Amino acid sequence: MKHRKGRVEGEILRELTKIIRKNIRDPRVSNVTFTAVECSNDFSYATVYYSLLTEDEQAQKEAEAGLEKAKGTMRHLLGQSLTMYKVPELIFKRDQSVIYGSKIDRLLADLKKQEQDRQN
């Protein structure tokens, strides 16, 4: 059963990525990238994790509002492309791992710069 769940999550991720690029014209979601999907055991809910290229708080709120507005359309189009009995309800959550990774990159760059300053 776990293998099927993984396949379904991967297929939902691929289809949602296609849908947001081709069918959703809202400029608020133009910088959104879906990173992962986790489905409930009965496939009634799908938590979709997304990231943004910007760390601007206003852009994050706008992207969240855009995703919520497009949720119904995305679910409808997802239902047309998937061969499932029931299309899962979509729940969008911000993926914090991208922010965490960029923070670590900045810290490492700062450490490297400090090390170079000490040597000079």
UniProtKB/Swiss-Prot annotation:
Localization terms from the record: Cytoplasm
Primary localisation category: cytoplasm
GO molecular function, one term: ribosomal small subunit binding
Function text: One of several proteins that assist in the late maturation steps of the functional core of the 30S ribosomal subunit. Associates with free 30S ribosomal subunits (but not with 30S subunits that are part of 70S ribosomes or polysomes). Required for efficient processing of 16S rRNA. May interact with the 5'-terminal helix region of 16S rRNA.
Gene3D superfamilies, sorted: 3.30.300.20
UniProt GO cellular component terms: cytosol
Gene Ontology BP terms: maturation of SSU-rRNA
PANTHER family, A to Z: RIBOSOME-BINDING FACTOR A, CHLOROPLASTIC-RELATED
The species this protein was found in: Lactobacillus delbrueckii subsp. bulgaricus (strain ATCC 11842 / DSM 20081 / BCRC 10696 / JCM 1002 / NBRC 13953 / NCIMB 11778 / NCTC 12712 / WDCM 00102 / Lb 14)
UniProt cross-references to HAMAP family, sorted A to Z: RbfA
Family statement drawn from the similarity comment of this UniProt entry: Belongs to the RbfA family.
UniProt keyword list: Cytoplasm, Ribosome biogenesis
UniProt xrefs under InterPro entries: KH_dom-like_a/b, RbfA, RbfA_dom_sf, Ribosome-bd_factorA_CS
Pfam families (UniProt xref): RBFA
Subunit text: Monomer. Binds 30S ribosomal subunits, but not 50S ribosomal subunits or 70S ribosomes.
SUPFAM superfamilies registered for this protein in UniProt: Ribosome-binding factor A, RbfA
Superkingdom: Bacteria
Protein name per Swiss-Prot or TrEMBL: Ribosome-binding factor A
